[in-house]
From Swiss-Prot:
Name of the protein described by the UniProt record: NAD(P)H-quinone oxidoreductase subunit 1, chloroplastic
InterPro entries linked to this entry: NADH_UbQ_OxRdtase_su1/FPO, NADH_UbQ_OxRdtase_su1_CS
Catalytic activity, EC: 7.1.1.-
Gene Ontology CC terms, in alphabetical order: chloroplast thylakoid membrane
TM region positions: 27-47, 98-118, 129-149, 165-185, 203-223, 248-268, 269-289, 297-317, 340-360
Function: NDH shuttles electrons from NAD(P)H:plastoquinone, via FMN and iron-sulfur (Fe-S) centers, to quinones in the photosynthetic chain and possibly in a chloroplast respiratory chain. The immediate electron acceptor for the enzyme in this species is believed to be plastoquinone. Couples the redox reaction to proton translocation, and thus conserves the redox energy in a proton gradient.
UniProt family annotation: Belongs to the complex I subunit 1 family.
UniProt keyword terms in alphabetical order: Chloroplast, Membrane, NAD, NADP, Plastid, Plastoquinone, Quinone, Thylakoid, Translocase, Transmembrane, Transmembrane helix
Pfam family, one: NADHdh
Length: 360
């Protein structure tokens, strides 16, 4: 009996140990995801505040100043207000499509953050096909917009959804060709490998200098993918009221609002990773890898700071562009994508391929 009791105690202790291992394993899985989501939310709140302050400066007026110091909590106050607003649904609309559309738009953009390297070895999923995964996932978002427009049973919403789909297709191809040119230069589809390939030559090793034409095309295409002025035709207020968002209210409207800024942030991060050297400080004789080897926490912190500094520099350009340029017509937008950007990006890809072949 004593031997039997001892065996039972041993088995129970083993089961408890395995249970603790499973709990710790789940914690190690969810902590990075939760940290990334929290960082993304904070980044979006900062972008909203920056846009309001920059737009106020451009228009020579006073921006938000009552919600928190310098109006920093204004975006949080607006989000809280949307949470408590009534969630309306069109009586003759397609309820499943109407409800699922915003979720598809947000989730497809959130998944793209998993392949962004914020610092050395600080990436949620270091995949060999990270860039390809981003392009594949980003092509899902227009489906959600089209579903929202169709499910609203509103001519303005449906036309906005069609415009969003047409605009996304028109500018997704030049953007993909620019990304392929970067992949050829780096000999990899991994975002981490692309950053490390630029770090070999410091500041002059950035793909911005090796691919200036591709950078300009990527810049224009990313703004069009984000549906920002001068490419905000899917939600042009003077023509379509609010486009595919016309029938939405409350939290679902808030999801579209958040999705637009999430898309802007992910585009800026990919500009940093693909063309601006990522987390590298790009100062001669100073390397993030050396700092990382000396002090891992300090090196990681510096890498995150450099990545975000480059990202918000591009965000400033995007925000200033919105408040300074007029909106294009639909025919001008499509002509720019199909007749100019597509041939130039294809020629840039062929030129890059030729250089890579001759350098072998």
């Amino acid at each position: 009996m004593i031997i039997y009791a001892t065996a039972v105690q041993t088995i129970n202790s083993f089961v408890r140990l395995e249970s603790l291992k499973e709990v710790y394993g789940l914690i190690w899985i969810f902590v990075p995801i939760f940290s990334l989501v929290l960082g993304i939310i904070t980044g979006v709140l900062v972008i909203v505040w920056l846009e309001r302050e920059i737009s106020a400066g451009i228009q020579q007026r006073i921006g938000p100043e009552y919600a928190g110091p310098l109006g920093i909590l204004q975006a949080l106050a607006d989000g809280t207000k949307l949470l408590f607003k009534e969630n309306l649904r069109p009586s003759r609309g397609n309820t499943p499509l109407f409800s699922i559309g915003p979720s598809i738009a947000v989730i497809s953009i959130l998944l793209s953050y998993s392949v962004i390297p914020f610092s050395n070895h600080l990436v949620l999923a270091d995949l060999n096909i990270g860039i390809f995964l981003w392009i594949a996932i980003s092509s899902i978002a227009p489906i959600g917009l089209l579903m929202s427009g169709y499910g609203s049973n509103n001519k303005y919403s449906f036309l906005g959804g069609l415009r969003a789909a047409a605009q996304s297709i028109s500018y997704e191809i030049p953007l993909t060709l620019c990304v392929l040119s970067i992949s050829l230069l780096s000999n990899s589809l991994s975002t981490v490998d692309i950053v490390e390939a630029q770090s070999k030559y410091g500041f002059w090793g950035w793909n911005l200098w090796r691919q200036p034409i591709g950078f300009i095309i990527f810049l224009i295409s990313s703004l069009a993918e984000c549906e920002r002025l001068p490419f905000d035709l899917p939600e042009a207020e003077e023509e379509l009221i609010a486009g595919y968002q016309t029938e939405y209210s409350g939290i679902k409207f808030g999801l579209f609002y958040v999705a637009s800024y999430l898309n802007l942030l992910i585009s800026s991060l990919f500009v940093t990773v693909l063309y601006l050297g990522g987390w590298n400080i790009s100062i001669p004789y100073i390397s993030i890898l050396e700092l990382f080897q000396r002090d891992q926490i300090f090196g990681t912190t510096i890498g995150i700071f450099i990545t975000l500094a480059k990202t918000y520099l591009f965000l400033f350009i995007s925000i200033a562009t919105r408040w300074t340029l007029p909106r294009l017509r639909m025919d001008q937008l499509l002509n720019l994508g199909w007749k100019f950007l597509l041939p130039i990006s294809l020629g840039n890809l062929l030129l890059t391929t030729s250089f890579q072949l001759f350098s072998l």
